Amino acid sequence: MGSLRTRQLFHAALLWLCLPLPLLLCENLHCYYSPVLEKEITFELVVTECPPNEMCFKGLGRYGNYTALSARGCMLEKDCSQVHSLRLLGTVYTMSYSCCDWPYCNRAVALEPLTAMLVAAAVVACSFCLT
C-alpha cells in the first residue's frame, strides 16, 4: 500500500515538473490569428508564431456602445492597451487591444496557464486513483 502511494506521489511531482517545460523551452510565442472581422462572422483561428519581442493580442472594435469587430494576432508590447480609430466599409470603429504573454492566450475563452496546469494535474491524479 505504501509503495503504491509513494509511486503515485512521485508521478504527481514529476507531472508538476514536466508540465511547464514546453513553455520555458519555446523561443517565440505562439498565438491565434484572425483578421479584423465583424463579430458575428465565424473564422477558424489560425496558429501563428510571433516575432521576438511581440505578444499575443485580442482586439475589439466598438461603434458607440456596440462591439462590432474582433481581431487576434501578435503585436509589440508598446502598442498594447492602445486605442485607435479604424475605418471599415465607411464606418469608423474604435479599436482597443489587450495583450498577454503565454502561448495561445488570445483564444476566445480565457483560461489562465495555472488553471490549465491544475486541471491537467487533477486529471492525471484521478487517473492514478482509479487504477
Swiss-Prot record:
An example GO biological process term is: single fertilization
Lipid moiety-binding region for GPI-anchor amidated asparagine? 106
Q: Which residues are glycosylated?
A: 65
Secretion signal span: 1-26
Entry keywords, A to Z: Cell membrane, Disulfide bond, Fertilization, Glycoprotein, GPI-anchor, Lipoprotein, Membrane, Signal
Q: Which residues form the propeptide?
A: 107-131
> Which Cys pairs are S-S linked?
31-56, 50-74, 80-99, 100-105
Cellular compartments annotated: Cell membrane
Please name the InterPro entries in this protein's record.
LY6_UPA_recep-like, Snake_toxin-like_sf, SPACA4/Bouncer
Membrane topology term reads: Lipid-anchor; GPI-anchor
Mind naming one GO cellular-component term on file for this protein?
Answer: plasma membrane
Ranges for the UPAR/Ly6 domain?
31-106
**Expression by tissue:** Expressed in oocytes. Not expressed in testis.
Additional note from the record: Zebrafish oocytes expressing O.latipes protein Bouncer can be fertilized by O.latipes, but not zebrafish, sperm.
Summarize subunit and interaction data from the UniProt record for this chain.
Interacts with spermatocyte complex composed of izumo1, spaca6 and tmem81.
What does the similarity note say?
A: Belongs to the SPACA4/bouncer family.
Function, as annotated: Oocyte-expressed fertilization factor that mediates sperm-egg binding and is essential for sperm entry into the egg. Necessary and sufficient to mediate species-specific gamete recognition and fertilization, which is essential for vertebrate species performing external fertilization. External fertilization cannot guarantee that only conspecific sperm reaches the egg by precopulatory mate choice: proteins such as Bouncer can therefore support the selection of conspecific sperm.
Q: What is this protein called?
A: Protein Bouncer
Which gene holds the coding sequence for this protein? bncr
